[in-house]
Amino acid sequence: MGTDIGDLLQKRKIELSDLTNQVVAIDAFNTLHQFLSIIRQRDGNPLVNSRGKVTSHLSGLLYRTASLIEVGIKPVFIFDGKPPDLKSETLNRRKEVRESSLEKWENAKVEGDLEAAYKYAQASSKVDQEIVEDSKYLLSIMGIPWIQAPCEGEAQAAHMVLKKDADYVASQDYDSFLFGAPTVIRNLAVTGKRKLPGKHVYVDVELELIELEETLGVLGINREQLIDIAICVGTDFNKGLEKVGPKTALKLIKKHGDIHAVLREKGVEIKELDRIRELFTHPDVTDDYEIKWGKPDSEKLIKFLCKENDFSVDRVKKAVERLKVVSRGRQQTLDQWF
């Protein structure tokens, strides 16, 4: 997903406690996809209720969000709206990958290859409309604000940080910087150990802070040039130039100044180039939103999670109590939220 410019960015390790009392605009689609990919059984099957309905995303939202609130982080989730028509090719390609992965997952389970089954199961994850609606409802009864973006969620989150309605964007994708986000947190949804694909090697997944101005200063470019680099590499709206990775793209843009000059030099074109640039420099966003945190509704949480989705009553009650303890223990701070 997004553009592959991560190797160019200046990343700094931080702790959850560094985000205390900070408003974090979370890319909801990205986060839900992480939960659906990671919260699975050994053979790749997701968590489901007694009716076979997937609940991995609900588990992730409840327990991870509770952990964030417990350390004083103020989360607000941003949901994608209608995608730009230039994204249709990328969306079709993702659909093909999901369908292929689903078939490979089933074959791996039959063959008893649990490692392959888990890998392909992760790649088959899909955030559908039912998952989105259930997630919005759960956040509402948890007292967590969410915002419906008119188009790209990352663009809306970046807009909110630029307006100083939020302090950080949280997303795994790097598109946030192309939309102008000054500060982005990665790995907020999932930390700990992660197995590298196809290897018996585990790496630590830690919180990362990336600041746009720091990266631009180190690279010696401006935001428009970063957008041009991303377009050279490839974005959700276009295929990249052949055999051009982020480091080569950086050299090309610094040498020629902008992507138009690069394309002239190479004798190639990128269709709808100006429209692609416009999607990043002037994205479709809204100011029609309210960020307000509320108190968790214990009865509705128990009904929705335990009675309707077969969650453990004890675990849900403990999560609710954690939220209530925070509410009682930090009342002065929380009064500013509500």
From Swiss-Prot:
Pfam families to which the protein is assigned, alphabetical: XPG_I, XPG_N
Keyword rRNA-binding (UniProt): no
Enzyme Commission number: 3.1.-.-
Region annotation N-domain: where it falls in the sequence: 1-98
GO biological process assignments: DNA repair; DNA replication, removal of RNA primer
Record keyword Cell inner membrane present: no
Annotated stretches, region: I-domain: 116-257
Recorded superkingdom: Archaea
GO MF annotation: an example: DNA binding
Region (Interaction with PCNA): 330-338
Cofactor(s) it depends on: Mg(2+)
Sequence positions that bind Mg(2+) 2: D173, D175, D236
Keyword entries, A-Z: DNA damage, DNA repair, DNA replication, Endonuclease, Exonuclease, Hydrolase, Magnesium, Metal-binding, Nuclease
Cofactor note: Binds 2 magnesium ions per subunit. They probably participate in the reaction catalyzed by the enzyme. May bind an additional third magnesium ion after substrate binding.
InterPro entries to which the protein is assigned, alphabetical: 5-3_exonuclease_C_sf (IPR036279), Flap_endonuc (IPR023426), Flap_endonuc_arc (IPR019973), HhH2 (IPR008918), PIN-like_dom_sf (IPR029060), XPG-I_dom (IPR006086), XPG/Rad2 (IPR006084), XPG_CS (IPR019974)
Sequence positions that bind Mg(2+) 1: D27, D80, E152, E154
Family of this protein: Belongs to the XPG/RAD2 endonuclease family. FEN1 subfamily.
HAMAP family: Fen
Function according to Swiss-Prot or TrEMBL: Structure-specific nuclease with 5'-flap endonuclease and 5'-3' exonuclease activities involved in DNA replication and repair. During DNA replication, cleaves the 5'-overhanging flap structure that is generated by displacement synthesis when DNA polymerase encounters the 5'-end of a downstream Okazaki fragment. Binds the unpaired 3'-DNA end and kinks the DNA to facilitate 5' cleavage specificity. Cleaves one nucleotide into the double-stranded DNA from the junction in flap DNA, leaving a nick for ligation. Also involved in the base excision repair (BER) pathway.
Record's subunit section: Interacts with PCNA. PCNA stimulates the nuclease activity without altering cleavage specificity.
UniProt-listed NCBIfam families: fen_arch
Protein name, per record: Flap endonuclease 1
Species in which this protein is naturally found: Methanosarcina barkeri (strain Fusaro / DSM 804)
Underlying gene: fen
